[in-house]
Amino acid sequence: MAAAAVVAATVPVQSMGADGASSVHWFRKGLRLHDNPALLAAVRGARCVRCVYILDPWFAASSSVGINRWRFLLQSLEDLDTSLRKLNSRLFVVRGQPADVFPRLFKEWGVTRLTFEYDSEPFGKERDAAIMKMAKEAGVEVVTENSHTLYDLDRIIELNGQKPPLTYKRFQALISRMELPKKPVGAVSSQHMENCRAEIQENHDDTYGVPSLEELGFPTEGLGPAVWQGGETEALVRLDKHLERKAWVANYERPRMNANSLLASPTGLSPYLRFGCLSCRLFYYRLWDLYRKVKRNSTPPLSLFGQLLWREFFYTAATNNPRFDRMEGNPICIQIPWDRNPEALAKWAEGKTGFPWIDAIMTQLRQEGWIHHLARHAVACFLTRGDLWVSWESGVRVFDELLLDADFSVNAGSWMWLSCSAFFQQFFHCYCPVGFGRRTDPSGDYIRRYLPKLKGFPSRYIYEPWNAPESVQKAANCIIGVDYPRPIVNHAETSRLNIERMKQIYQQLSRYRGLCLWASVPSCVEDLSHPVAEPGSSQAGSISNTGPRPLSSGPASPKRKLEAAEEPPGEELSKRARVTVTQMPAQEPPSKDS
């Protein structure tokens, strides 16, 4: 690969006259002025440009999306409006649905050009096709530009025989054969906008202003301050802080997990990438440029861009699969016979499982809208194949409600992967809801922060308070079973049962395929940076060592060896994924002393 500079591509400012285009730029995910080629296309040769965001108040009132994500979105829109004001323009927030709004705007504003960022997700493609048809019938030119992903996803699929790659290793092999991602374009400036200003009415805020949470029907009483401030301005500040860690960029050394790792970081970027407040291409090339500067012009490895590439991998897998977020009709998803257990699901979602590590994570998620990626792994494993044996589809819905950075592709893809429903995850890997947290934060400060009921427990018992003597519970002013729930399951028993369930499922899949999947089960021991299980422990919250220690998994480990089948997926894989697996016996209820 040839080296690429981080300098944004220069976009010439074309002369604009009175007979130029009347443009509307439709903001959706790309809520920024930097690296926004579709917005630049709206400006080019135009006499008037209006920047529009369409918000459906009915959707806001009826949507399952939680208040933290709505707050982040509204903050991002406010920030965008503030930036546009500096260019003598404004953001037009239009109420309604696109199919109803655009015919009126086309006529009322005399629109001749509509621009927007390409949306790779199935729902977005369907919506945009309808709008493009409508615009064509109205004589409106439509310009779309790709800037939400690094690569052309259709090109990746084409290189893979017209099918999406279903392992990360295969995905990496494909993109290594492609050209580098396009460089980011420069930000829209006052020079771009000086001759194409839209008329702003005095009552703009009343008609087109960004609404408040209260106006959208959200109760804000008791709502704490935002841990994550939405908007492009904040995103760029965070990017600078993120890249100040030169040693990390040079060596790609991940800091060891500790209690502080679990808290929201001022350098975190995932919600900003999800809403497009930060360009993934700008992030990519800023990383690239800094690595080459520190490493004296060495070409950076793909592993440096792991956060971005895993995102890209899931976008590629989802782009042509409208059933990507569910089991039924999803050709890549193994049809595992999960249990229906609404009571257990509710306790998990509300942070009332009786396992302080799991409950603290879910409480942080509900309060702040974010949790560390390894915390996501822990609660996803607990809900699905680890303990509760509840479908990953339920986890997708809860995360979609609560998680700031949740989107269709990455959220559903991560849940399928972590539940061993797709992407060749190793099912022997199981997170211990006691040992993992204890190894990460031995003092238990994270639990005390989010579960103040347990703050009086000594560190010895805070991860398994059910084992604390009655005198310790009384001293902590928290009686287990009264003030804090008993464990919902006996982890040691249920996790062993669930591993057997998965083992039988994969054996059936192997027989159907005519091959044995056991060749892909790791037989070596990899040094783990982060604890997964506690082999040999006799505690109620741990799993015994029944075999070789599992490999670390997922985006957390750039050195992970994906030793599962790596051939390009074909029709055989689709057939295998649709096999109906024999129903396994329901898990036994937890023992009274669990």
From Swiss-Prot:
Organism: Rattus norvegicus (Rat)
Region (Required for inhibition of CLOCK-BMAL1-mediated transcription): 389-488
Alphabetized PROSITE patterns for the sequence: PHR_CRY_ALPHA_BETA
Regions of compositional bias (Polar residues) in chain numbering: 536-547
Name of the protein in its database record: Cryptochrome-2
Occurrences of domain Photolyase/cryptochrome alpha/beta (ranges): 21-150
Subunit and partners: Component of the circadian core oscillator, which includes the CRY proteins, CLOCK or NPAS2, BMAL1 or BMAL2, CSNK1D and/or CSNK1E, TIMELESS, and the PER proteins. Interacts with TIMELESS. Interacts directly with PER1, PER2 and PER3; interaction with PER2 inhibits its ubiquitination and vice versa. Interacts with CLOCK-BMAL1. Interacts with CLOCK. Interacts with BMAL1. Interacts with NFIL3. Interacts with FBXL3 and FBXL21. FBXL3, PER2 and the cofactor FAD compete for overlapping binding sites. FBXL3 cannot bind CRY2 that interacts already with PER2 or that contains bound FAD.
Entry's family note: Belongs to the DNA photolyase class-1 family.
A Gene Ontology biological process term: negative regulation of glucocorticoid secretion
Tissue and organ expression note: Expressed in all tissues examined including heart, cerebellum, cerebral cortex, lung, liver, muscle, kidney and ovary. Highest levels in heart, liver and ovary. Highly expressed in the suprachiasmatic nucleus (SCN).
Assigned keywords, A-Z: Biological rhythms, Chromophore, Cytoplasm, FAD, Flavoprotein, Isopeptide bond, Nucleotide-binding, Nucleus, Phosphoprotein, Photoreceptor protein, Receptor, Repressor, Sensory transduction, Transcription, Transcription regulation, Ubl conjugation
Residues modified to Phosphoserine: S89, S265, S298, S553, S557
Cofactors (names): FAD; (6R)-5,10-methylene-5,6,7,8-tetrahydrofolate
Annotated GO CC locations: Cry-Per complex; cytoplasm; extracellular region; mitochondrion; nucleus
Pfam families in the cross-refs: DNA_photolyase, FAD_binding_7
SUPFAM superfamilies: Cryptochrome/photolyase FAD-binding domain, Cryptochrome/photolyase, N-terminal domain
PTM characteristics: Phosphorylation on Ser-265 by MAPK is important for the inhibition of CLOCK-BMAL1-mediated transcriptional activity. Phosphorylation by CSKNe requires interaction with PER1 or PER2. Phosphorylated in a circadian manner at Ser-553 and Ser-557 in the suprachiasmatic nucleus (SCN) and liver. Phosphorylation at Ser-557 by DYRK1A promotes subsequent phosphorylation at Ser-553 by GSK3-beta: the two-step phosphorylation at the neighboring Ser residues leads to its proteasomal degradation. Ubiquitinated by the SCF(FBXL3) and SCF(FBXL21) complexes, regulating the balance between degradation and stabilization. The SCF(FBXL3) complex is mainly nuclear and mediates ubiquitination and subsequent degradation of CRY2. In contrast, cytoplasmic SCF(FBXL21) complex-mediated ubiquitination leads to stabilize CRY2 and counteract the activity of the SCF(FBXL3) complex. The SCF(FBXL3) and SCF(FBXL21) complexes probably mediate ubiquitination at different Lys residues. The SCF(FBXL3) complex recognizes and binds CRY2 phosphorylated at Ser-553 and Ser-557.
Xref: InterPro entries: Crypto/Photolyase_FAD-like_sf, Crypto/Photolyase_N_sf, Cryptochr/Photolyase_FAD-bd, Cryptochrome/DNA_photolyase_1, DNA_photolyase_N, Rossmann-like_a/b/a_fold
PANTHER family, per database record: CRYPTOCHROME, CRYPTOCHROME-2
